[in-house]
C-alpha cells in the first residue's frame, strides 16, 4: 500500500480526522471514530474493525513496528505525518504518534459486531446502564464486562458515546467486541428485553431490596440496571423492572460509584456462571 506523507497541519485529511475527536455528532454522522495509541489500533485490527485510515509518525513507525504492521495491512489509506501534526489527532498530553480512523462496526440484532463470534450460551445476561455520562466510568464498565465474559450491554437515555476517546482508552478495546445497543428511553429498552424473555432487575441502594447475591443468575436470562452516577436509576426504570436488587453494604457509605456497582454486578453474574468464561 502506498504511504502518503503529510507535512502541513492544514491538511484536509488531518482536519477531518481531528473532527472525530471533538463531538459525538461528528462521529455519528460520518460513521467513523478515532482510535489512538499503538496497542489500541492493533487491537482494532485484530478485532476485524474496518480501518479507513492510519496515521503515524516516523518515530512511531520505528518504535511500534510490531503493532503497526497488522494495522497497515488492513488500513485503506496510510499517512506518515510530521511530529508537529500528531497533537491535532490526539486526546492525550503525550501522544505515541499512532492513530486510526475506524468505521463503526456493523452489529447484529443482539448488538454484537457482525465480526464477533455469535453468543450460543443457553442463558443470556445483559448489563443495562442508564444515563451514565462519565466517560471514565463507561470505559471501566466495558473493560470489566469483557474481562468477566458478560458480552451484552444496553445503553439507555443520555449515556456518553462509547466511541469517545476516553471511553475507548478505558475500555482497552472492549468496544470492538462487545454487544452494545442504545435506547432512547427505559420503556424502549424494557420492551425489547421483555420480548427477548429477559428479566430486568433495578439495582438500588436500598437495604429492603433483594440482595443481588441471592439472584439465581445460573438459570434464565437476566438484565441488571445500573443508574446515573449522581441520581441513580429513573423512577420509570425502577417501576417497570421486574424486581429491585441491592448490593449489601457495611459501614456508613450510602451507595457505590456507578462503575464499582457495575463491576460487582458483573462479578455476581460470572460467579454464578452467567458470564460464561468458565463455561465456554
What role is predicted for each listed range?
Residues 4-8, 77-82, 179-188:
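Short acidic-hydrophobic, aromatic-tinged amphipathic segments that line or gate anion-handling sites
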Residues 46, 111-208:
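RNA substrate-binding interface of SAM-dependent RNA methyltransferases
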Residues 144-148, 162, 167-175, 235-280:
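Structured adenosyl-cofactor binding patch, chiefly the S-adenosyl-L-methionine
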Residues 37, 133-141, 256-261:
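Amphipathic alpha-helical repeat scaffolds
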Residues 201-253:
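Active-site/ligand-binding-proximal alpha/beta "capping" segment
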Residues 71-98:
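Glycine/small-residue-rich loop that forms an oxyanion/phosphate-binding "nest" at active or ligand-binding sites
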Residues 63-74, 237:
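Short, aromatic/basic amphipathic alpha-helical patches
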Residues 1-67, 159-160:
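Boundary-proximal intrinsically disordered activation/regulatory segments immediately upstream
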Amino acid at each position: 500500500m502506498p504511504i502518503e506523507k503529510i507535512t502541513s497541519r492544514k491538511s484536509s485529511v488531518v482536519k477531518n480526522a481531528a473532527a472525530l475527536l471533538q463531538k459525538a455528532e461528528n462521529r455519528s454522522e460520518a460513521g467513523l471514530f478515532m482510535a489512538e495509541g499503538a496497542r489500541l489500533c492493533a487491537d482494532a485490527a485484530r478485532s476485524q474493525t474496518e480501518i479507513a485510515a492510519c496515521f503515524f509518525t516516523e518515530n512511531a513507525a520505528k518504535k511500534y513496528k510490531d503493532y503497526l504492521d497488522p494495522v497497515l495491512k488492513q488500513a485503506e489509506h496510510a499517512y506518515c505525518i510530521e511530529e508537529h501534526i500528531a497533537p491535532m489527532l490526539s486526546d492525550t498530553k503525550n501522544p505515541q504518534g499512532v492513530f486510526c480512523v475506524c468505521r463503526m462496526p456493523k452489529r447484529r440484532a443482539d448488538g454484537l459486531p457482525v465480526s464477533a463470534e455469535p453468543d450460543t450460551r443457553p442463558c443470556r445476561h445483559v448489563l443495562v446502564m442508564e444515563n451514565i455520562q462519565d466517560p471514565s466510568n463507561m470505559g471501566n464498565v466495558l473493560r470489566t464486562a469483557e474481562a468477566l465474559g458478560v458480552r451484552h450491554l444496553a445503553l439507555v437515555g443520555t449515556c456518553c458515546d462509547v466511541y469517545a476517546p476516553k471511553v475507548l482508552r478505558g475500555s482497552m478495546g472492549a468496544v470492538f467486541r462487545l454487544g452494545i445497543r442504545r435506547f432512547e428511553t427505559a420503556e424502549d429498552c424494557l420492551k425489547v428485553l421483555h420480548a427477548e424473555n429477559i428479566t430486568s432487575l433495578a439495582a438500588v441502594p436500598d437495604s429492603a431490596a433483594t440482595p443481588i447475591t441471592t439472584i439465581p443468575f445460573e438459570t434464565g436470562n437476566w438484565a441488571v440496571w445500573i443508574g446515573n452516577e449522581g441520581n441513580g436509576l429513573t423512577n420509570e426504570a425502577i417501576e417497570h423492572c421486574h424486581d429491585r436488587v441491592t448490593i449489601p453494604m457495611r459501614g456508613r457509605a450510602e451507595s457505590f460509584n456507578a462503575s464499582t456497582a457495575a463491576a460487582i454486578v458483573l462479578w455476581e453474574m460470572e460467579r454464578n456462571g452467567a458470564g460464561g468464561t468458565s463455561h465456554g
